[in-house]
Amino acid sequence: MSDLPNNGILVGVDGSSCAKLAVEWAAREAAGRNVPLRIVHVAYPAVGAWAGWGVSPAPLPENFVPTQEDQARKVIDDAIEIVDAAIEGNDRLPVSSEILWSSAVPTLVDLTKQAQMIVVGYHGRGALARGLLGSVSTALVHHAHCPVAVIHDAAQPSAPTGAPVLVGIDGSPASELAIAIAFDEASWRGGDLLALHAWTDADWPDFPEVEWSATKATAEETLAERLAGWRERYPDVTVRKVVVYGYPARHLLEESKSAQLVVVGSHGRGGFAGMLLGSVSSAVVHGAGVPVIVARQR
């Protein structure tokens, strides 16, 4: 991003269908931003089977390690093929790949310290339920040191022409970073920016209409102030604004149906630096059918 260290896009792969979509999305993202792409497959190192208390590990089956290495190389080779197809004709994009023998979560979290963004599939090969966020993806959206793009298996890496980038804004520091990312995304994608601001995170179904009318004007003014400087920096981006009084997750999910990408902060007005994923962001990551970028701060 324009205001973040330019260390490229990192994508974690494991051979799953979601990871393959993540690779394609990451390749287009890196090409659009003209930044390096780093493909990483983290495989748990081979160890002998544990037979019980006080018993030495059982030996590994013959050819287990070579087979595991072959499988790891295939994951990387398949990912590189996807990248080549996604950026066909662009031979200027620096692409690197590597296999790391370690535990996936701490390794990827540590790698995010040097990344501009990490891209992961919504769930990996180990997902027991297709509708659940995978353990690696969950850890990254909670603990990564850079923004995290989560790609659903229903998402299309090539977004529909004219679809906007949707960003949720609440005035928190995390949403300020989300605004920066969203403007940058909309600019290089050539799309509009749809900025949605909820006056409150609360769900107030009986809020008096006359009072909301007055409050809405104040909320619209606040949103305009939040966007003013960014609109000057990105004059090529057309901005549309939506102000609602509450139910931010519900409204973001509804608007995401016609968006190509959603950007949300890692936590909202009630959060604090370093806290876990906020309720609104969590609902969007789980419920959106398009790629979602969680604007995690360093």
Question: Can you describe what each PLM-predicted range is?
Answer:
Residues 72-80, 223, 227:
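N-terminal membrane-insertion helices
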Residues 81, 138, 228, 250, ...:
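Active-site phosphate/pyrophosphate- and oxyanion-stabilizing loops and adjacent acidic/basic residues
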Residues 2-60, 163-213, 231-233, 238-242, ...:
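Small/aliphatic-rich secondary-structure junction motif
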Residues 94-96, 147, 192, 238-240, ...:
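Conserved beta-strand segments of alpha/beta enzyme cores
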Residues 1-5, 18, 44-47, 63-66, ...:
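Structural beta-alpha unit
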Residues 5, 23, 28-32, 105-158, ...:
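Gly/Ser-rich helix-loop-strand patches that form or flank binding pockets
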Residues 59-74, 212-219:
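A short acidic, glycine-rich active-site loop
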